[in-house]
């Protein structure tokens, strides 16, 4: 998993509530267990018409937002079914950070596990960031995870909270497996302990 330390990128404004996981990645694309290749189908119903052509009025089909790495929405992002394909699709599209007033719990957790930083901010702050994003390609946001601050184009810093353990995992680029493997030496040492460590070792001498 790639480390997340500081991201300066285009943000896409999507002022919509209750964006569910079926909107993020429709069920017909869930047959794969690969984490890559889903980005082209992220928000498929909104991005494409019945003939597979892009809908020009959808934000992620517009410049500069087709290159966005930050997504700003309204409440309850990621509601619906608990498909992990949803953060896979966002990440494969290029999204590394999602900002909203609230998230569905499972989606929120799955974002962290897949290298996406979800940030909760009040709706009025989300509105301000969306206004920044609408200024175009020259209006980029900086998300600094080390300092836990979002820097607006005008230089104003907006602090955000994040769980310390999850922050550590993103800063180090660790998923659950990576976190386990970071303790490989301790695991190996434990595996080589006697199977009944509570039984004292007794040396029996030779009887003469």
From Swiss-Prot:
Pathway: Amino-acid biosynthesis; L-leucine biosynthesis; L-leucine from 3-methyl-2-oxobutanoate: step 2/4
Domain of life: Bacteria
Keyword Signal: no
Keyword Amino-acid biosynthesis: yes
EC number: 4.2.1.33
Disulfide-bonded cysteines: none
Gene3D superfamilies attached to this UniProt entry: Aconitase, domain 4
Keywords, alphabetical: Amino-acid biosynthesis, Branched-chain amino acid biosynthesis, Leucine biosynthesis, Lyase
Catalysed reactions, semicolon-separated: (2R,3S)-3-isopropylmalate = (2S)-2-isopropylmalate
InterPro entries with a match to the protein in the record: 3-IsopropMal_deHydase_ssu, Aconitase/3IPM_dehydase_swvl, AconitaseA/IPMdHydase_ssu_swvl, IPMI_Swivel, LeuD
Top-tier EC class: lyase
MF annotations from Gene Ontology: 3-isopropylmalate dehydratase activity
GO cellular component terms, semicolon-separated: 3-isopropylmalate dehydratase complex
GO BP annotations, alphabetical order: L-leucine biosynthetic process
Assembly information from the UniProt record: Heterodimer of LeuC and LeuD.
Membership in a protein family: Belongs to the LeuD family. LeuD type 1 subfamily.
The protein's role, per its UniProt record: Catalyzes the isomerization between 2-isopropylmalate and 3-isopropylmalate, via the formation of 2-isopropylmaleate.
Name by which UniProt lists this protein: 3-isopropylmalate dehydratase small subunit
Annotated gene: leuD
